[in-house]
Amino acid sequence: MTILHQSEDQIEVASEVAAASEAASEVASEAVSPEAASVAPEVDLVVQEVVTVAIPEVATVATPEADMVAPEVVTIVLEVVTIVQEVVIPEVAMVVQEMITVLQEVATVVQEVVMMVQEAIMVLQEMHTEPEMLHVKDHQPGKPFI
């Protein structure tokens, strides 16, 4: 097999890796929350950039050393893709899920505060509408609140 054929094979492998990475990204984005899925394309772009830039650059160098290194680069890229699929995307999904949980807790606290404010408003309205309640504006200096 000539160096040219090996380079073409390596480029073909790189294309297949890129396609597999894209497919994995789509599957991952369907499996995780929408927020994490929005991060998956960015991760996929990094992987594709490595695949489409690193492997062809190594494959275009027509030396026996490059032919020996190119399969190692393919192996490394495949390992990176695997790590991204098995570790990075699930970790991102987990962090996003934790963020959603925290935001839900914050929303609950905000709802409780809103309810307390509404109760305070109701109490103030009752005080305002009850004739026996003396208003501060009706108070005359030097006289007791009776």
From Swiss-Prot:
State the Gene Ontology BP annotations: DNA damage response
Q: Which domain of life is it from?
A: Eukaryota
Other remarks in the entry: Partially overlaps NPL3.
Protein name per Swiss-Prot or TrEMBL: Putative uncharacterized protein YDR433W
What is the source species? Saccharomyces cerevisiae (strain ATCC 204508 / S288c) (Baker's yeast)
Organism lineage reads as: Eukaryota, Fungi, Dikarya, Ascomycota, Saccharomycotina
